[in-house]
């Protein structure tokens, strides 16, 4: 049964009707504001933006892997934005430096030959994409930068080259690969020399032999084009 209306004394001579029912109902009602928006909607928008950015990063990594000869991780913890900008300016045009979360890079390389890079997926990594066969020339700028800035802690965390994983302790093998000029000299020297020299070239590691053959084919193409 609804409570009856009555008046409360006030400092003025006027009195106003007061309903217990309306009072108790209103006391349990949260105030509304015309500009109030549910938080869940904002969270949904932020989540969608975050998901889109992650998808874009994965796609960027996949694009960088096209025509990529070597992919290396660099521990970047502690590096400043200024240092990153300086490092990027010292890299050759065929080498790209990208900062991306390990989980996103792992998603991009899943099911590919680059999946061998899994041991690198620890800590904070920047990723070096080398789009050139001149591997030593691509790695040297960072080594120089590392020594100049005394960044011993920010070393290569690993790399994948021709489907094989190279740990930090194996980078010497990558940094001492023969350059194209050296391959030309080696090939020409073996062809002009005794048969034993040619045999020695053929018996070289498969990786070096492939590079020698590629260089020789390229040389023949260049000579054919100049005629």
From Swiss-Prot:
Gene that specifies this protein: RPL10
Q: How does it assemble?
A: Part of the 50S ribosomal subunit.
Alphabetically list the UniProt keywords: Chloroplast, Plastid, Ribonucleoprotein, Ribosomal protein, RNA-binding, rRNA-binding, Transit peptide
Where does this protein come from, organism-wise? Answer: Nicotiana tabacum
Q: Where in the cell is it found?
A: Plastid, Chloroplast
The protein's name is Large ribosomal subunit protein uL10c
- What does the entry list under GO cellular component? chloroplast; ribonucleoprotein complex; ribosome
Provide the primary localization. plastid
Spell out the family assignment given in the record's similarity comment.
Answer: Belongs to the universal ribosomal protein uL10 family.
Any one Gene Ontology MF annotation carried by this entry is: rRNA binding
